[in-house]
UniProtKB/Swiss-Prot annotation:
Superkingdom per UniProt: Bacteria
GO CC entries: cytosol
SUPFAM superfamilies attached to this UniProt entry: DhaL-like
Protein name: PEP-dependent dihydroxyacetone kinase 1, ADP-binding subunit DhaL
Swiss-Prot/TrEMBL keywords: ATP-binding, Cytoplasm, Glycerol metabolism, Kinase, Magnesium, Metal-binding, Nucleotide-binding, Transferase
Species name: Listeria innocua serovar 6a (strain ATCC BAA-680 / CLIP 11262)
Domain DhaL residues, every copy: 6-194
Subcellular location: Cytoplasm
UniProt-annotated binding residues for ADP: H38, G39, I40, N41, A79, S80, G120, M129, R166, D179, P180, G181
Amino acid sequence: MTYDKDWALRWLNDFGERVQENKQLLSDLDQAIGDGDHGINMARGLSELKKAFTEKEPADLTDVFKTAGMTMVSKVGGASGPLYGTAFLNMSKAVDSETIDAEGLTKVIEAGLEGIEKRGKSHAGEKTMIDVWEPVVNALHQEDLTDDVVEAALQKTKDLKATKGRASYLGERSIGHLDPGAYSSALLFHAMLQTEVS
């Protein structure tokens, strides 16, 4: 498998479409345990990203992720902008050639996870997007990432008590709700798995 600039563009455009389709659901999930604007914020940021890609085609794979990072930081409100932004910027730094193989992709996604952990001062088990990213990275290392793995990771956030972010104010009452950031991250990785390599 070889992943290149065109693949990454298709992946992130598909992610944008999935977020647009699930905008209301993401905001509803966020309404239960957060500010209620995750869907709107993410949809706006990804729509701006699509525009950025159209106006100036990225030079290479690194540039795709760098553009994504800068756009998410500047156009997405709330905590998710800086977190996704940092993830993509870290991913751009982990790309070391025009194309990457499966091992390279694992390294790139892992760099994204590390960026989120550092920026959010968080780790797995705190009911955040990390609870999807970490199982995805682990599965990539084992070469067995599937849509089921992504979905299982997302569903597990329902039983976790939030100890980070706005949701942590709810304490025990955050249990029983899916984490919105984990949900949008699941959309990101479903899109990645469904984006065919050219």
